[in-house]
Amino acid sequence: MKTKHHGQMSESFLTAVFLSLSGGLQDAYTYLFRGKVFANAQTGNIVLLSANIMDGRWDKVLHYLVPLCAFALGVLAAEKMREHFQAMQRLHWRQLVVLGEVLLLFAVGFLPQSQNLLANAIVSFSCAMQVQAFRKVNGYAFASTMCIGDLRSGVEAFCIWRKSHEPHAKDRMVRYFGIIFLFALGAGCLLYTSPSPRDP
């Protein structure tokens, strides 16, 4: 039997669809068009930051350090918005997060290649707000801007389903792998609809 979840719209699978598409698109955008920096995958930025420090390439350090700091500030901003606007009646605080994200990403589109550092900082800040505000789909923990946790959870659910044929495990497996597919689709759509990537 298919599991139904009666909860907030922010935890619906439809919401996860759009957030995952957006997450993949944003990561592909900053990596391919803004100087090979990850907007979401801060682990990759930490690796590249460390590599450049060890190589003595100090001109590249800010290239990866600024998005890291912006991501941390984005998490703080989302938490502050939750604290201040959680009791609002007309709007849900997560709707304000989405509105802020849309405005920030719209502004990034007008920044020239010479402003890649600022563009990457804004996108990382926006991604952090998204990942902090939207952390569940149909009651299951998920991340719309990175895949490692979703991949682990999907494979775990597959192992449980293969062993016990538990319907809930199958449902989780399908949802997690679906989210990963949508993330990849978002990244692919950017390439399909954009000109060839250009390095600064």
How should each PLM-predicted stretch be described?
Residues 95-104:
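Structural signature of the two symmetry-related core transmembrane helices
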Residues 1-9:
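Short, Lys/Arg-rich, polar N-terminal cytosolic tail immediately upstream
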Residues 19-22, 66, 70-74, 78, ...:
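Alpha-helical transmembrane segments in multi-pass membrane proteins
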